[in-house]
Amino acid sequence: QTDTTVGFSSSNDEKLSNLDYLQMILQKELEIRARQKQIKLRRASKLPNKVCELSNLNKGLEWQIKQLSHLTWLNEGQNIILLGKSRTGKISLAVHLAETAIDKGHKTYYAPIDTFVSIVENKDINPKAGAAFSYMRECNLIIIDDVFYLAPTRSELQAFYRAVTFLNETRSIIFVTNREISTWLDVVEDKHLCQTLLDRITANCQIIRLTDR
């Protein structure tokens, strides 16, 4: 007969207690591993250290930003164009969306357009560039900053077009730019290729204009 005297636990209680303890240890281990994975993904993403204060963004975007944070667009393979002048919070919002994706286990990668084009052009001859491009191919989300901030050369535009067309087949891309989309054609030599690029990236895309508060 099991001893039920105060100060002693029954054999059933003891077994249950041990099981609870093991479950607690397992849960803690899973939490540690999940956190370590997030840290690893954050480091690999090359995201800038930006803190997104959503309260500092245009008030008219609150509902849209809340919807974006649900990541439905990412699961559906949509692109996003963040458009606005300097200091309107484009990068902060891009980082916020990327970190939200990382929290859900998605691989992401950030690069300014000049870095992105350099990686694409040198991926077959430079091991570091090759590794970066290979990682991009594993990602669910890529962020390209400063799109057409400076006019690309013909060869740069061609490299950009080829890479975006390839990568956009199976993943979402966030394009960050301070240049109105309608003026992209004005800064390139090959306007036909640029128009083809525009048609491609805007076919399944949300365009978000950020303005001063």
Segments the model singles out, each with a brief description of its role:
Residues N49-S69:
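N-terminal pre-Walker A segment at the start of P-loop NTPase domains
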Residues S69-G77:
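Phosphate-binding P-loop
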Residues G77-L93:
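Walker A/P-loop nucleotide-binding motif
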Residues E99-A111:
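Post-Walker A helix-loop "phosphate-sensing" segment adjacent to the P-loop in P-loop NTPases
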Residues T2-K46:
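Interdomain "pre-motor" coupling segment immediately N-terminal to P-loop NTPase/helicase cores
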